[in-house]
């Protein structure tokens, strides 16, 4: 079974006030994207990696891949106008059976998260990393006023990777874009 990681790294860093894509900011001397790609590079379940980034960042991505001698990156491809279009561009380059879609800025992904989400996808058809919500959640009425408290025991915050059978997620994206 071939497993591909699609790393979406097309952000501009605007919300955090950065003057460039946040995945190229350095932590402990290395780019955030280095740590993200490395997690998938080192994982023995991952066969190849596709990086999706902005047109102006493709060269910087290639420099990073070369600089750190990353072997599993098979494509660096241009993103789209939206995250969904960027994901679709990455999926179009993917081959094989299972695909993990992961945010390039989420550098702290663990082997267990990767391995468990792949295993759960194979078992259940799809999977995503999620963490129980610890904050107090409120629901609002149509006027925006608090209507009640949501039971946080039944809520999860979904993160990445999100894992799917490639043919299924491609079909869903095609339908969503039609």
Q: Each predicted region: which residue ranges?
A:
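N-terminal glycine-rich phosphate-binding loop and ensuing alpha1 helix
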Residues: 1-58
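Short, conserved active-site loop motifs that form the nucleotide-linked donor/cofactor pocket
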Residues: 3, 73-75, 155
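Hydrophobic packing residues within well-ordered alpha-helices of enzyme cores
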Residues: 16, 61-65, 117
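Conserved N-terminal catalytic core of the sugar/cofactor nucleotidyltransferase
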Residues: 34-96
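Short aromatic/hydrophobic "clamp" motif used to bind/position activated sugar donors
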Residues: 99-100
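Conserved core of the sugar-phosphate nucleotidyltransferase
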Residues: 108-178
């Amino acid at each position: 079974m071939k497993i591909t990681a699609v790393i979406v790294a097309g952000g501009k860093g605007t919300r955090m006030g950065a003057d460039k894509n946040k995945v190229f900011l350095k932590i402990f001397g290395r780019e955030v994207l280095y740590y993200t790609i490395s997690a998938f590079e080192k994982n023995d379940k991952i066969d190849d990696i596709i990086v999706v980034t902005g047109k102006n960042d493709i060269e910087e991505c290639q420099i990073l891949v070369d600089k750190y001698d990353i072997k599993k990156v098979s494509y660096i491809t241009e993103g789209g106008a939206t995250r969904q279009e960027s994901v679709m561009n990455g999926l179009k380059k993917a081959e094989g059976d299972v695909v993990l879609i992961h945010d390039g800025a989420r550098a702290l992904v663990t082997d267990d998260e990767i391995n468990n989400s792949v295993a759960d996808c194979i078992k259940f058809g799809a999977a995503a990393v999620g963490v129980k919500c610890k904050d107090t959640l409120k629901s609002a009425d149509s006027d925006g006023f608090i209507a009640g408290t949501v039971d946080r025991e039944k809520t999860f915050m979904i993160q990445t990777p999100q894992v799917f059978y490639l043919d299924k997620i491609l079909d869903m994206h095609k339908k969503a874009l039609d």
